Amino acid sequence: MAAESGFWFKLKHMDRGMLVKKMLSFDNVYVIAVRRIADGKTLPEDKDREFVQITDTRDFWYADPSLFEWKGDTWLFVEAFDRKTLLGGIACCKLCDDPAEDVKKLRVVIKENFHMSFPQVFEWNGGLYMIPETGDDHSLILYRAVDFPDKWERVVRIQTESVLADTAVVKKESGRLTLLTSELSTKRQYFQRYHRMYLTDKGNGRWELTDDEEFLSKQEFSYIARNAGSLYEEGGQIMLPTQESTETVYGVRLNFVRYDENEADIFAQRTGSIGPEDVTVRGFGKGRASGGRLDGVHSYARSRDYEVIDLYYNEFTPLKHFRKIAKKLKY
């Protein structure tokens, strides 16, 4: 049987209230929120302490936060979504004493003519590197910092047959990176499956991206097989946040799993899960089911001192459909 198109599938299966909003030009707007870690208590257990919103601007809203610690400082990297072009770039700022004030210094550091998101920054081979999501370009791109954090150069761009989303670095060796990424289904929206891939420096400017075929043979498409942030350590365990969608709605919940490189089932050791009803953001409250404004929780990052999440709500956007058509015609 032929797969239903995205539009007709959503029309048939989406919650009626949400469907009406979408047809009336409501669109997702993402909110990044941050809080300091207190007494070692973090999500998914600590659901009571309030997060503080990182305010969006007239030109940008922000999503896909990641945290990178460097020389005693904590840097926040995000997707900066341009409301006019409908394309994301990569922005950053340093977190200090007052995150709500710090983020007013967010500035775009990488911008391409295609959509970018999910910036993953890491130290490797004596340098600082970044792999953002560039699935809109059907590529995987490795950048190197020339003047951290403001100037980056491309090291390599590898064309990919599939659209790869939300790539995380799970292992670093001297000449090779092990990546955990998701292939997006061409038949059903929000359906994806995990790939473990190796990005290898072959020398003399040559790079190779290969699949772990044994790992791939054990993966299935699902609504949960997608990263929601970088690996982090908790109590001697390596943890991975993942995002959960539904048939018709993207990024509604987060799952937390213990990551084991020898385990093909990423979700074999799931330790917790949260939705918008479990998180309080100043000015937004909790999820709509709890009387707040939030519709979904989508990403999570943690450092020694901070936790950062992104959530979304629906906002009336009268030019939504016009801008999407204009973007397709332009690109």
What are these regions (language model features)?
Residues 1-331:
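Carbohydrate-active catalytic/glycan-binding domains of CAZyme proteins
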